[in-house]
Amino acid sequence: MTYSNKPTGSSLRSSRNSTLEPQSLVHREESKRQEGPKGQNLRIGLASPEQIRNWAERILPNGEIVGRVLKPHTIHYQTHKPEKDGLFCERIFGPIKSGFCSCGKYKGTRDNDSPPFCEQCGVELTESRVRRHRMGYIQLSSPVTHVWYLKNRPSVISHLLEMPLKDVESLVYCGSFIIGPGTYSKFRLLGTLRIGTHERAYKRILTRKRLRTRKHFLQTKNISLASRSVTLEKSQEKVNDSLKLSQRIIIARKRLLRLAAKPILEPKLICNRFYVPWRIALELFLSKWYRDCESREIITGGYGIQRMLINLNLQNKLVSLQKNWERLVEQTEKMWFPVSGKYKNSDHSADIQREKRLIIRSSKIIRDLIQSKTQPEWMVLSVLPVLPPDLRPIVELREGQLITSDLNELYRKVLFRNEDLSIWLSYQGTLVLSGLLARLQRASLQRAVDALLANGMGSSTFRDYNKRAYKSFSALIKGKKGRFRENLLGKRVDYSGRSVIVVGPLLALHECGLPREMALELFQPFIIRELITRQLAPNLRAAKSMIQNKEPIIWKVLQVIVQNRLVLLNRAPTLHRLGIQAFQPVLVGERAILLHPLVCAGFNADFDGDQMAVHVPLSWEAQVEARILMWSPSNLLSPATGRAVAVPSQDMLLGLYVLTLEGSVGIYGSRQRSFVSSSLLFTKNHEIKESKEEDSQSKQDFIRSLDKKSKPIKNSKYSLYPKFIENKSSFHKFPIFYDYDDVIISIHQGHLNLFSFLWLRWEAKYPVISSRKGPIEYQFDSSGNSINIYDNSYIKKNRKGNSFSKYILTTAGRVLFNQQIQQSIQEHFSSLRK
C-alpha cells in the first residue's frame, strides 16, 4: 500500500512533449492536513508517473530533492547501516531510530534551536515510524509494460490495441518492432516486423511493388538475368553475360540485407571504365518505399506499446465499437429464419458471436478507463514505485544471520538491469553491437519488473539459490494470507476459537460451555479495558502481564464480562441459517466446548469428534442482532419446513423414560431392591455418587425428622399428617414431603434416588387422576371431615365435600422432571414480560 498527502500530478495527455512514464499499482489519497481532521480514502487503480513522483519526492530544507533510489544496495555488510541512495536509505525513507541521524551527529536529543534535519548526512530528525509509509521510486531507463494488464485474461492491452496477444508479447519482449510515426500508417497492413525475419518482411514489400527481380539476389549463389545464369565464385566478381554496358553491375556474394544495413558504400570494382557503387546497385532492386521505411524510427519494447496507447482515442474507439456492434446485429437479423429459427450459416454465426464477445470486453475496458479518468498509457511503467522499507524489512536473528524480504532481492535485480541498460544506451551508435545488446537488456529489464510485480506470470520465474520462487508483490497482497484480506478487509485477531464438542446435559438450551483458556483469549481486549477502568491495572502493558500470569482477579473479571455477552457457534459446512447460532457462554474447566444435545440437529452435529468454531460479536449492534436473530431459543423451527428442530431423541427419550419410571413396574420389578441400593444420585455439586441402602430404622428417623421440619399443627382438625398414617402399614414406609424443594434437597443430600417412592402434598387447584378403583378406606372425624384413601393418593374433604388437602404417591424422578418443566415455563413467561 502507498500513502499520499500531495496533490495528484497532471495527466500525461496534457503535455505530449513530456516523457511518458508509468503508473502504479495501488494508490492512496490523503486529504491535506490544513483541511481539518485527517481523512483517508482508498482507491485501487493506475497512477500517473507524476503522481508516483509526488508520493516519493521530498524537498529538504537545503533545497535538495530526495526520493529516487539510485543504487541496488541495502545495508553495509560490516556496520549494518543503510547505504546512501539505496533501498534502505535514511535520507529517502527516514531514520531507523527516532531522532538519530545516519552520521551520528544527532542522537535523539534535540533543542528548540536544532535544525529539522542533519546538515551532514541529510537525514530528517523525525520518528522512525515514517519508514512504514514513505515511498521511493526508480526511474527506469526504458519503459516497461505492466504485467497485470498484459498477462491477465482477458489482456487489457491486447483488447485496446486490437492485436493478438502473441504479437503484443513479442513486441513487449523485443522480439519484434514497429515502424515510427511517419510511416506507421502507411505500413499498417504489414503488421509488426519480427526481428530475424527481415527477408520475409522485405519480400512482402517488394512483392506488393511488383519487383520480382529480388529472387536473383537472395538465398542462392546463382544469379539469373533473362534466360542465362552464372555462379559467383568470389566475394566480388564481374558479371558479363550479354548485358548492355549501362546494365552491368558489380554484385557481391554477401546477403542483400547485410548490404542494405550499411548506409554508404564505396565503389568496389571498375566495370567497363565506370565506377558503380554498391548503393546504386541495390537501388536497382529496392523501391522507394523501402528507402522511406529505412529512414524511419524502429520502435520496440515497452516504448512501442506506450506510443501505440498514446495514439488511442477512447471516445472514438467506443463509437467505432458501437458501430461494429450495430453491423453485427444487422447481420444476425438477416441470417435468422422466422420459421425454423435456425441460422443459415452456423460457422458464420459462430464468428459473429465471437466478435460480439470481443466488442463487449473492449467496451467494458474502455468505459472503465473513461469512468476512472485513467489514461491507457499509464499501463506502461517508466517510474517504478518502491515500497516503504518497513514493509520489506531485513531482520537479524540471534545468531547474527540476516534474513530479508524477497521484495528486496527483486528490487535489486531491477536496479542492476536498469543500470546495465542505461550503460548500453549511452554507447548506442558508437559500438557495433550496442543496439542489439540494448535490445536484449530491455527485455531483461522487462522480465525483472514482471518478477517484482507477479513472479511467474511473465516469461520466466525468478528463484533463489535453493530453487525457491521469490514471493512477488502480487503474492503478498492476494489470497487469504494477503495484505488486503488478512490485514485490511479483515484482520486476523483472537476473536475466534475452535475445539471439539462434547455433550453438556446440565446446560440450558441457550447456554454453551466455553473453556476458560479459550475465553481468556477471546475476551482479552474486554478484560484489559475492564482492568484499566476499575483501576486494577495502570496501563495496557500491566494488564497484559496480569492476563499472562493468570492472576485470580482475572477470572472474576472474565466471569462478569461473559454474563452480558453472547458467542456464536458455527459448525462447517454452514448449509443453512441453523448452522451458526448464538449462545450464552458458561465458563468450564475442560478444554472442549459443551453443547446442549437439543441443538445438535440444527448443526447436524454429533459427539463423535466433531469440531465447532467460536466467534465473538464485538459491537453492541452485533450483540443485539445475535440475540434477536441467532439466539438458539429463537431457532427451534426449521426455516425450510416449519417443523420443530429441537426435538428430544435417542438418549434424551431414554432418560425421560427412566426418570418417570416406577421401580416396581415392568422388568425392574425384580431388580428394585438391588437397583435402589446402588443407584446413581445427583448431589449438590452436580456430581454423581453411589448411595447405600438404609435400614428401616433410619427411614423411620428420617420420616420423624421431616415431620419436625414441616412443623405440623398438633391436635388440629387440619393437621398436616393425620394420625392414621402412622398406623397404616401401607403408608408409613414412604416419606412425606410438603413441596418440590424438600424433595430436591433430599435428592441432593443422598437420602433419595430417582426411583424412591414418596408422598407429596398436592395443591388443591390441580386435579388428581385417581385410580378407577374405589377408595381403599374412608375415614371421618367428629367435625364431619372425611378422608378418602386410594392406592396412589388420599384426599381430605370438608363436610360439604370440598377437598382442601391432597397427597399423591409418586417417585423422586417424576418430581424432578415436573419441577424442571414448571421452572422452564416460568422462566419463559418471565422473559416475555420483560
Swiss-Prot record:
Annotated spans, Disordered: 1-45
Biased composition (Polar residues): 1-22
Chief location: plastid
Basic and acidic residues: bias regions: 26-36
Location in the cell: Plastid, Chloroplast
Keyword Cell membrane on entry: no
InterPro entries: DNA-dir_RpoC_beta_prime (IPR045867), RNA_pol_asu (IPR000722), RNA_pol_N (IPR006592), RNA_pol_Rpb1_1 (IPR007080), RNA_pol_Rpb1_3_sf (IPR042102), RNA_pol_Rpb1_clamp_domain (IPR044893), RNApol_RpoC1 (IPR034678)
Cofactor mode of binding and number, as noted: Binds 1 Mg(2+) ion per subunit.
Ligand binding (Zn(2+)): 101, 103, 118, 121
GO biological process assignments: DNA-templated transcription
Record's keyword annotation contains Transferase: yes
Domain of life of the source: Eukaryota
Gene Ontology CC entries for this record: chloroplast; DNA-directed RNA polymerase complex; mitochondrion
SUPFAM superfamilies the record matches: beta and beta-prime subunits of DNA dependent RNA-polymerase
Role played: DNA-dependent RNA polymerase catalyzes the transcription of DNA into RNA using the four ribonucleoside triphosphates as substrates.
Alphabetized HAMAP family for the sequence: RNApol_bact_RpoC1
Similarity annotation: Belongs to the RNA polymerase beta' chain family. RpoC1 subfamily.
Full protein name: DNA-directed RNA polymerase subunit beta'
UniProt source species: Staurastrum punctulatum (Green alga)
GN (gene name): rpoC1
